[in-house]
A protein has these predicted regions:
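Active-site beta-alpha loop architecture of Rossmann-like, nucleotide-cofactor-dependent enzymes
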Residues: 69, 185-188, 240
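Conserved AdoMet
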Residues: 30-104
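Non-catalytic accessory regions of SAM-dependent methyltransferases
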Residues: 1-47
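Conserved Class I SAM-dependent methyltransferase catalytic core
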Residues: 210-274
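Mobile active-site "lid"/loop adjacent to the S-adenosyl-L-methionine
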Residues: 184-215
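Conserved SAM/SAH cofactor-binding pocket of Class I
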Residues: 94-192, 218
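Short loop/edge segments at beta-strand edges and connector loops
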Residues: 72, 164-165, 262
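Residue-level signal for inorganic ion chemistry
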Residues: 27, 65, 95, 123, ...
Length: 276
């Protein structure tokens, strides 16, 4: 039997439990390190025992809603491959837009940067890769997340600092840029979250009390003493949170400009605090 026939049958089983059928072929192709052309040719060939065994192994994990990136063990972000597992969130394309915004607005200077809630280190390391004259510090409340972020720094061969901290609790000094993609999903919005996210990704990095605004409040209340005179704050937000977060920072920073910016789909996704 051709591999394509076996794959099609397995994909139907995935669709029956609400999983995307394409996850199986994607994970198989990446696991075998095949180009798209090589994958298409392989699908038309007779299935080998090894290939069938690999498909079954992948499918068994997808059936219990384990994300493809965790199965593969890495995720692509901003042109680089980051190791990911259940210790951290899988980096999202929307967060790449936040990184691109920071890079486009801060091009030449040597800056000090603090990433709050670094997770896999995707934001901090991406900034450090593109701006080798920046001094970047990555912080997280989770020691497990920091451990993985440090592994990514070693693999990518980028030197940044790491601090275990609940927001600013263990942070000293002032920074030119404070960036954060914090947990911002409220418990009332839990039903909007996909099963593969709920069952596998760390809830500490997903959900926040106070209707999802707890970490934004902490940042608003404490960032001032950790910002340089011309310092800026860049935040990722939930698509329904723009106006509230804007008002929160307008109250905390009455003399600064607060911008709500949209992602590529036209949804509120970033808040920027700067001097204008």
């Amino acid at each position: 039997m051709k591999l394509a026939q076996i794959l099609a049958e397995m994909e139907k089983q995935l669709e029956a439990v609400g999983e995307e059928a394409e996850s199986l072929s994607f994970t198989f192709r990446i696991s075998k390190n095949l180009s798209f052309t090589q994958f298409v040719l392989k699908m038309q060939a007779e299935a080998t025992e090894d290939d069938i065994e690999l498909l079954k192994k992948i499918q068994s994990q997808l059936l219990v809603h384990r994300p493809a990136q965790y199965i593969i063990g890495n995720a692509e972000f901003h042109g680089h491959s980051f190791k990911v597992d259940e210790r951290v969130l899988i980096p999202r394309p929307e967060t790449e837009e936040l990184v691109n915004l920071i890079l486009s607005e801060n091009q030449n200077s040597s800056l000090k940067v603090l990433d709050i809630g670094t997770g896999s280190g995707a934001i901090a390391l991406s900034l450090a890769i593109d701006r080798d004259n920046w001094q970047v510090t990555a912080s997280d409340i989770s020691s497990n997340a920091l451990e993985l972020a440090q592994e990514n720094a070693e693999v990518i061969d980028v030197a940044i600092d790491f601090v275990q901290s609940d927001c600013f609790q263990a942070i000293t000094g002032k920074y030119d840029i404070i960036v954060s993609n914090p947990p911002y999903i409220s418990e009332t919005d839990r039903e909007e979250v996909g099963l593969n996210v709920l069952t596998s990704e760390p809830h500490l990095a997903l959900f926040a009390v106070e209707d999802g605004y707890a970490v934004y409040r902490k940042i608003a209340e404490n960032a001032q003493k950790h910002l340089t005179e011309k310092g800026k704050i860049y935040l990722e937000i939930g698509y329904k949170q723009g106006e509230y977060v804007k008002k929160l920072f307008e109250s905390a920073f009455p003399k600064m400009r607060i911008r709500v910016l949209q992602d590529q789909f036209g949804k509120d996704r970033m808040v920027v605090v700067d001097r204008g």
